[in-house]
Amino acid sequence: MRGLFVGRFQPVHNGHLKALEYVFEEVEEVIIGIGSAQVSHTLKNPFTTSERMEMLIRALDEKGIPRGKYFLVALPDINFNSIWAPYVEAIVPKFDIVFTGNSLVAQLFRERGYKVIVQPMFRKDILSATEIRRRMIEDQTWEELVPKSVVEYIKEIKGVERIKMLATDLEKNEKELQTPLRIPEF
């Protein structure tokens, strides 16, 4: 049996891995859909699809999950909820069951006749990508919330620096740069 699990993975964290561990116990193969695949270099979606794929591969390798047990599939947004499930069906290989922590995703796939297992979020108070990005911006400890291999990769690609840059008020900085210098008169 093949399952579907969709996330944005901005970045991959221990909550994602906990959910995926459960999915791998339930099915032989997993399709991991990488949502918002067309978006990167924004505060909400700082990492590219290929960077998120690399994070997933490294994290699953670290957990000892064989690469032959999963597929990674990029899922660009369509912003049209009523046709999102058939859109996903058209992009990914055939699947039998959907695993999600999102009630809308659950409803959309139930309407298509799929069995859906709604997973409780594991420590959602701290194991959320939003919280991890916030900690990065504020120079707080974030490393224990993500797999070691993902910490290493984020450092390799200077991901924290990217997120901090995205969090700055670029518009204000641009205006300051374009303001003519006033030379004081003596």
UniProtKB/Swiss-Prot annotation:
Name the top EC class: transferase
Q: Which GO terms are recorded in the biological process aspect for this UniProt protein? A: NAD biosynthetic process
Q: Where in the cell is it found?
A: Cytoplasm
Q: In which pathway does it act?
A: Cofactor biosynthesis; NAD(+) biosynthesis; NAD(+) from nicotinamide D-ribonucleotide: step 1/1
Q: What is its main location?
A: cytoplasm
- InterPro entries listed in its UniProt record: Cyt_trans-like, NMN_Atrans_arc, Rossmann-like_a/b/a_fold
Keywords assigned by UniProt, alphabetized? ATP-binding, Cytoplasm, NAD, Nucleotide-binding, Nucleotidyltransferase, Pyridine nucleotide biosynthesis, Transferase
Gene Ontology molecular functions = ATP binding; nicotinamide-nucleotide adenylyltransferase activity
Which reaction equation describes what this protein catalyses?
beta-nicotinamide D-ribonucleotide + ATP + H(+) = diphosphate + NAD(+)
Q: Which domain of life is it from?
A: Archaea
Give a yes or no for keyword Transferase in this entry: yes
The UniProt record lists the EC number as 2.7.7.1
Offer a single GO CC term for the protein.
cytoplasm
* Similarity remark: Belongs to the archaeal NMN adenylyltransferase family.
**Stated name of the protein:** Nicotinamide-nucleotide adenylyltransferase
Q: Which organism is it from?
A: Thermococcus sibiricus (strain DSM 12597 / MM 739)
